[in-house]
Structure formats: C-alpha cells, structure tokens
Amino acid sequence: MLVKKSQISRKFIEKKSGIVHIQSTTNNTLITLTDLEGNTQFFVSAGTLGFKNSRKSTVYASGAAAEALASKAFNEGYRTIIVKIKGLGYGKKSAIRGLQKSNLVIKQIQEVTPIAHNGCRPPKKRRV
C-alpha cells in the first residue's frame, strides 16, 4: 500500500522591497521601515526595546534595534531593502551590521545627513 506524503500548502508571501531610515542621534537611535512610497510600516528605537537613559545611546542598543526591525520586516514579507542613514551618532555602523545579520538583502546604502553650509549657529560646547 502506497502512502502519499501530505503536501504542505505554503503560504504565498509576496516579496516586498522597503526603505530603512536610520536616524542616529547622540542620545538614541531611531529606525523606521517604509515602503517604496514612503508610508511607515514599522518603527523601532533603542528606547522602545527597554533601554533607558544613557544606555539608549550605546552601540549595542542600536544593533539590537536594527535586529528587531529586521526580524519584524522579514516576518512581514520584506526581502530587499535600501538603507538611508542620517545623523552623527555612534550607532550608525552597528545598526547596519544588525541589518546585515538578518536575512534581508541590502541593495543600497545612502548617507543623507544634512550638512550646513554656514547656516544656523551650532549649539555652544559643553563644559563638564
């Protein structure tokens, strides 16, 4: 008697592309996933993961935020992303490394940090 293998029906997942915006400030790292039109799909920051106060600005926190967003995006059907980086904080490189660890394919990395050409006066230096 022949026994047929039961065919497992695979859920059809549309392979989506998206844009990941990384804004790295001195106090926090904000990571947003948008679709190609610019509509926000997911948002993760170091603060939403439970890091508080000065721990939000660490390199580890930004990497953890990127990994959390990447796993959410992969489960939702995103496969390829474009990364846009903005800001002068510490967490830029570790956030990119966190995205590279995931199964998402990074097509392009863009630096979109605005650079002032003698515009507004910068804030005064800290005296500690």
Curated annotation (Swiss-Prot):
One of its GO terms (biological process) is translation. The keyword Mitochondrion applies. PROSITE patterns: RIBOSOMAL_S11. InterPro entries: Ribosomal_uS11, Ribosomal_uS11_CS, Ribosomal_uS11_sf. It is found in: Mitochondrion. GO terms for cellular component: mitochondrial small ribosomal subunit. Keywords: Mitochondrion, Ribonucleoprotein, Ribosomal protein. It comes from the Eukaryota. Pfam families: Ribosomal_S11 (PF00411). One of its GO terms (molecular function) is structural constituent of ribosome. Belongs to the universal ribosomal protein uS11 family. This is Small ribosomal subunit protein uS11m.
